[in-house]
Amino acid sequence: LNDYYWAGPNGGAFWNGQLIHVAEPRPHTPDDWLSTPSNTHRRYAIDFVGKTRSIGATVGSFCYTARGSAIGGLIHTFGIWDIAAGLAILAAAGGTASQLGGAPLDLPSLLDGHTFRAPVLLGAPAHLPALRACIQLRA
């Protein structure tokens, strides 16, 4: 794919040498997409005006959201090793990650090597409330 993402030590997130940012705050459109896990249809009810796409890699959700290609990402069941680099890139691009219910992501609790099993939403802070409103856990 020749896609390279990194966060610089002096700030900024980059994709193939270009500075990237999360999507600007605006109403969602049918052309927007949300990166989701492959089993989303079994775990969540999503009423999103745009598309949902499973790209097969947790770090991909972070990177596509960081560059503003995806409006956001939904992830679950991960360890710190799955998200450390992606989280740094997302934060440097102006994004954040928090639990679907709105609670902050407790990173220190992941340092013991356990797997986090709750849904986490990625995106620009301004987009997260609207995304939360359209994603529900199935019973």
Label for each model-derived stretch:
Residues L1-C63, H114-A139:
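Acidic beta-strand-loop-alpha-helix segment within the catalytic core
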